[in-house]
A protein has these predicted regions:
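Binuclear metal-dependent hydrolase catalytic cores
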Residues: 1-122, 128, 133, 208-245
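Cap/insert and terminal regions of metallo-dependent hydrolase folds
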Residues: 111, 120, 128-230
């Protein structure tokens, strides 16, 4: 982890930010030579500042225990970098373009297109499919997109309502309008040239084979369902995408 230079955040929902400090700590203790950059939209300064403050005692204890030569205190403090929706980050042959995602009412919400030596990957963050999604994904080798099953979420909302659990019923119903439906992602693939589409951040989380069938149904040939530990290798000078489990 000592090679980790930065973390890109799509938005500030808890499930997308909760491990920031663990990444900071892990790379710091392994010898990261500079401060860890945390890049995100408007509000990133306050978020990173709050996380730094929250773990101030943790950093002090570790420096006191292991010594400042091993753990330089200044390298344990993360650095916030604000991105706009049209920001281009470049480092040598690596190019990362931020674009506006649609995750209402969350604003800002970003997605990213990553390009390196002729290969490209788009990461949706959490988003509906929009014209911006089509534009940024056109010609990409791989699109990683969150995916929601409308029938499954609707059934859960209705089930909670039938049990008199109105709060959970409303929460599930609210989820419907800020993740991309399976149908919209499949339609996207028919409208643009794209190498492969992988569903991740599945809603609802398919805890059994029955729920997984919602996502597997009508899956196009160049689509797949990603899982934790899955690697996508895009060899330079090729159009191949090698998918492995590790």
């Amino acid at each position: 982890m000592f090679r980790l230079d930065g973390i890109f955040l799509t938005h500030f929902h808890s499930d997308h930010i909760s491990e920031i400090y663990e990444a900071n700590l892990g790379s710091w203790v392994q010898g990261r030579p500079e401060r860890l950059k945390v890049l995100g939209g408007r509000g990133i300064e306050s978020l990173v500042g709050a996380v730094n403050l929250t773990y101030a005692h943790d950093r002090e204890h570790r420096v006191s225990h292991h010594g400042a030569d091993l753990l330089p205190p200044e390298l344990g403090i993360m650095q916030a970098v604000e991105l706009a929706s049209d920001t281009v980050f470049e480092d040598g042959e690596l190019r990362i373009l931020a674009y506006q995602a649609s995750h209402p009412p969350i604003d800002p919400a970003l997605g990213f297109r990553v390009e390196y030596r002729g290969r490209s990957v788009v990461i949706s963050g959490d988003s509906n499919v929009t014209d911006a999604t089509l534009s940024i994904s056109s010609g990409a080798d791989l699109l990683l997109h969150d995916a929601l099953s409308v029938p499954a979420v609707t059934s859960m909302s209705e089930g909670f309502a039938a049990e008199g659990r109105a709060r959970l019923s409303k929460i599930m119903a609210d989820v419907l309008d800020y993740h991309a439906s399976l149908e919209s992602i499949i339609e996207l693939g028919s409208e643009i040239d794209i190498g492969m589409v992988a569903y991740y951040h599945l809603v609802p989380n398919p805890s059994n084979a029955l729920f997984m069938r919602f996502f597997e149904r009508d899956l196009p040939d160049n689509y797949l369902i990603a899982s934790d530990g899955m690697w996508f290798d895009l060899p330079v000078g090729s159009e191949d995408i090698e998918v492995t489990e590790r």
